[in-house]
């Protein structure tokens, strides 16, 4: 399946929602430190309900060690600064999807390290800043999974 990477997530309910999504879709979740919360935060647990035990979750000290542990998969960054629509990408098993922290998105040095075709944007109405992190992850995962025939 896919790897979902949350880079320094800040809001526990968003991460809890993503844990539940990963449990239901078979994606592996990777959290890049520092986290903006403790893993035993009640809001994180509540959002994830009882799905925590069904999700594959790993914490990493930095993005480089995460990617190394995964064997350097093909990486797509989801960002409001991307110019390529996410639905134009062809996803494959084992791809990794990277999402930035809620308050600021991915740092420029992370985005600049990726080719433009791997910096993807979800469509939004003009004048809107961004979508909720867990909603963005859900849209991305389900589009990629749809492309694989939900297998």
What is each stretch, according to the model?
Residues 1-151:
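Post-transcriptional modification and biogenesis factors for structured RNAs
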